[in-house]
């Protein structure tokens, strides 16, 4: 469906309108408030930048509110990418709240405005995680056929947080591929609504 120009235009138009409304109605006061809280709670920058893979494997810079201590590393002692996990000591007290409520992802609306992310789509993974997964997970690279999103079908179906096993990642990718194959505008709206519901309900995999 997203190989059709009119569908891409519809999705892009929605992304721009939705993001602008977010910044005007919510971002104008949420961003300054969170910036102050983050700066007062721990040393380090307000925003966290990370290289991730976007459409057609293009490297993009993904923005988030910093939720970990400045000195934290995402590479373990064996040189492998270390995902955030439950009770992760790298995460600050404020960071736990931000991640639990998805508020750490809010700066990605800027990514949406500039066009390298969408409101809805497969979540973009860090470079190291892509490299680890592409050899182990069937059809993994096909998830990069569309622009990645802030939220996605996999996330509203419980595939959030750490992917401890290859099977966990395969399940996430299967949801991503289903989304790509079955995309329609109403599916995006359903995912957005379910994301909001999950935020208020709480997600045990959000950490």
Which stretches of residues belong to each language-model region?
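A hydrophobic, helix-centered structural microdomain
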Residues: 3-71, 111, 185-207
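Aromatic-acidic/polar surface patches that form glycan- and anion
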Residues: 26, 83, 87, 99, ...
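Short amphipathic alpha-helical interaction/hinge segments
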Residues: 73-76, 121, 204
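A short, structured surface patch at a secondary-structure boundary
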Residues: 84-147, 191-199
